Amino acid sequence: MGISRDSRHKRSATGAKRAQFRKKRKFELGRQPANTKIGAKRIHSVRTRGGNKKYRALRIETGNFSWASEGISKKTRIAGVVYHPSNNELVRTNTLTKAAIVQIDATPFRQWFEAHYGQTLGKKKNVKEEETVAKSKNAERKWAARAASAKIESSVESQFSAGRLYACISSRPGQSGRCDGYILEGEELAFYLRRLTAKK
């Protein structure tokens, strides 16, 4: 029996079983879930209706994640799934889907922040090795102008100290073959942090 996306097999609103007046059709087909896992990139192409293609990511380990408040995006490594709104089983098996909350490597974002604002992020304040490197006057002027906007919220800064950021996947790895998303901030981050602590 193939997977079908029709609704003719469902009971009616009154609970009556519908009569089968036709067989399954090709345009109603469904496919098995991709169940994308974290690992070395493995992507299969699937021929779909109209000769189009879908890209089924079976294994993927990196993605482009955007930092909305700073207006940048960086390619970074995905560490693991920590929360899923629909199913705890997907957390246990580290399955990547849209809307999954994952932890990503903070290094590319930390390096960008330090280059852009000239301030260390997620490190102890008493470390002084970097101050020996001479910076140009032009760089100093740029950093001085940007200093006012170099504030980030404390809950995000504490994640930089740990080297892992919470992010939400916004692409569909089983359809597009990509695992892209955005870093959680503000009320959304607070909501998911509450969910994570409640789960423990």
From Swiss-Prot:
Q: Where is this region: Disordered?
A: 1-31
Q: Which GO terms describe its cellular component?
A: 90S preribosome; cytosol; cytosolic small ribosomal subunit
Query: Phosphoserine modification sites?
Result: 66, 69, 73, 86, 154-155, 158, 161
- Does this UniProt record's set of keywords contain Coiled coil? no
Question: From the UniProt record, which GO molecular function terms apply?
Answer: structural constituent of ribosome
Q: Where does the UniProt annotation locate this protein?
A: Cytoplasm
Family annotation (Gene3D superfamilies): 3.10.290.70, Ribosomal protein S8e, subdomain
Q: Which PROSITE patterns match?
A: RIBOSOMAL_S8E
Q: Which UniProt keywords apply?
A: Cytoplasm, Phosphoprotein, Ribonucleoprotein, Ribosomal protein
Spell out which residues are annotated as carrying Phosphothreonine.
Answer: 62, 107
**Predominant localisation class:** cytoplasm
Q: Which GO terms describe its biological process?
A: maturation of SSU-rRNA from tricistronic rRNA transcript (SSU-rRNA, 5.8S rRNA, LSU-rRNA); translation
Q: How does it assemble?
A: Component of the small ribosomal subunit (SSU). Mature yeast ribosomes consist of a small (40S) and a large (60S) subunit. The 40S small subunit contains 1 molecule of ribosomal RNA (18S rRNA) and 33 different proteins (encoded by 57 genes). The large 60S subunit contains 3 rRNA molecules (25S, 5.8S and 5S rRNA) and 46 different proteins (encoded by 81 genes).
- Tell me what else is known: Present with 15900 molecules/cell in log phase SD medium. There are 2 genes for eS8 in yeast.
Stated family: Belongs to the eukaryotic ribosomal protein eS8 family.
What this chain does, per the record?
Component of the ribosome, a large ribonucleoprotein complex responsible for the synthesis of proteins in the cell. The small ribosomal subunit (SSU) binds messenger RNAs (mRNAs) and translates the encoded message by selecting cognate aminoacyl-transfer RNA (tRNA) molecules. The large subunit (LSU) contains the ribosomal catalytic site termed the peptidyl transferase center (PTC), which catalyzes the formation of peptide bonds, thereby polymerizing the amino acids delivered by tRNAs into a polypeptide chain.
Output this protein's name: Small ribosomal subunit protein eS8A
Native organism is Saccharomyces cerevisiae (strain ATCC 204508 / S288c)
